[in-house]
Amino acid sequence: MNAVFPGSFDPITSGHMDVLTRASRIFEHVTVTVMHNARKQGRHLFSLEERLEILREATAHLPNVSVDSFSGLLVDYMRQQQKGIIVRGLRAVSDYEYELQIAHLNRQIGEVETVFIMAATRWSFVSSTMVKEIASYGGDISEMVPRASAAALKRKFAQQYAAREAELSSAGERGAQQAAESKT
């Protein structure tokens, strides 16, 4: 039996990897699907292509896992791929309440079943949002994300830091020039 593990994966975390690894032991094949929502364009740190590349690298050691993307309703993707099971990871009871509503809706409109896998307790606090916040301040995220995500975050924030530094340096030079001009 085959399953789909959907998400935005911006980026994939150790919690995602925990759920995915366990799902790969349960199902013959798992497709990790990056759901692309055009209305959320610009809200992600990583582009769709970057997220796909990070996922491919992070899942390379799992022979029965593939990576894909889709724009639209998940149930439409499931129909197209002829897959009937969605895997969702849960961190806390609050996740369950939301995911249960979505699971019922998916079953009603798409005849798709949802299998919930609880994330290991050590990952219950980890989210992509939290990881990005910590990484943006140079914090250690090595335990919270696979190596591919950590490297991508480091590169992304180094670029942003360099751009910020250049902007501040340019602003400082303009300020010094204006100060010198005002003295004359």
UniProtKB/Swiss-Prot annotation:
Q: Which organism is it from?
A: Deinococcus geothermalis (strain DSM 11300 / CIP 105573 / AG-3a)
Which InterPro entries does the record associate with it?
Cyt_trans-like (IPR004821), PPAT (IPR001980), Rossmann-like_a/b/a_fold (IPR014729)
What protein am I looking at? Phosphopantetheine adenylyltransferase
One GO CC annotation, please? cytoplasm
Name its GO BP terms in alphabetical order. coenzyme A biosynthetic process
Q: So where does substrate get bound?
A: S8, K40, L74, R88
EC number, UniProt record: 2.7.7.3
Q: Which residues bind ATP?
A: S8, F9, H16, G89, L90, R91, E99, W123, S124, F125, V126, S127, S128, T129
Function, in words: Reversibly transfers an adenylyl group from ATP to 4'-phosphopantetheine, yielding dephospho-CoA (dPCoA) and pyrophosphate.
What catalytic activity does the UniProt entry give for this protein? (R)-4'-phosphopantetheine + ATP + H(+) = 3'-dephospho-CoA + diphosphate
Pfam families tied to this protein = CTP_transf_like (PF01467)
Enzyme's top EC category: transferase
Entries under NCBIfam families matching the protein? coaD_prev_kdtB, cyt_tran_rel
